[in-house]
UniProtKB/Swiss-Prot annotation:
The name this protein goes by in its record: tRNA pseudouridine synthase B
Active site, per annotation: 38 (nucleophile)
Pfam families membership: TruB_N (PF01509)
CDD domains registered for this protein in UniProt: PseudoU_synth_EcTruB
Reactions that this protein is recorded to catalyse: uridine(55) in tRNA = pseudouridine(55) in tRNA
Transmembrane parts of this sequence: none
Disulfide pairings: none
Function statement: Responsible for synthesis of pseudouridine from uracil-55 in the psi GC loop of transfer RNAs.
Protein's GO biological process: mRNA pseudouridine synthesis; tRNA modification; tRNA pseudouridine synthesis
Superkingdom, natural source: Bacteria
EC number: 5.4.99.25
Keywords linked to the UniProt accession: Isomerase, tRNA processing
PANTHER family: PSEUDOURIDYLATE SYNTHASE TRUB1, TRNA-PSEUDOURIDINE SYNTHASE
Amino acid sequence: MFGFLNLHKPLHLTSHDCVAKVRRLLRQKRVGHGGTLDPLAEGVLPLAVGSATRLLPYLPGAKQYQALIRFGVRTDSDDLAGEVLESKNVSYLTLAAVEQILPTFLGEIEQIPPQYSAIQVNGKRLYELARAGIPQAVPSRMVTINDLKILGWRSGNQPELDLQVTCGEGTYIRALARDLGDRLGTGATLAGLVRQQSGGMALDNSVGLTALEKIVAEEEHIPLIPPQEALSHLPTVQLNSELEKRWFHGQRLLLPDLPVGVVLITSELGPVKCLGVALVTPEDHGTVLRPKVVLN
């Protein structure tokens, strides 16, 4: 079994829980995910099955979320799963004030990930250290937010904002909610999150765990996405039989006029077949193709 699965992760399960369930369902040892989704979030969780796990780093990095942000509340995890540090009446907050501040979060920005995150510090994940009562100084990182679209606003003692976020990989929506509240002086936390797009996969085309169980039980076709479709954003280089032999031996190939950068390698023999991923660099006499992932 070989390919990608667009899984709809349900609420309250960890990404690892989903991977474990799919391993058992498909009877496959090699299943991995393309980006952690918090237990209190649902939506697209790209999975790779079989040797396709080696291709996970090459999925598109862009992501889209629908976030529910609650103002007037601060927690130690920056979402409702954590301990409440502050809860107050901020009924004075207006949508106009939010609209004025949102553009400052667009583009490449500096962001400090939440204390409760999967980032490793000295070999330990931050959430493990936080649960053990050993908070760390979390280093900031540069992330990219491409678009912020207001979908809804509810006034009240603790107003709520529905916000669509289009961003690059590594962006924490919990941190965005926290920082938005800090910038407005009200405090804020993430009260709900749905990942609508990730790894080039969309929520509309995802399959839930219950549906997948039924598919397996009824011995229907598993909706695996072929690598050449999942990695269609990459330029494709086709190899003939002679070049294929050299490819499978891990040899670098000097070829003319290839697109520089990461490319998808396929066979020109028979049906389209993914052979792996390579890096193309310019040389004096053409371009050189260096294997990065070779799939047998």
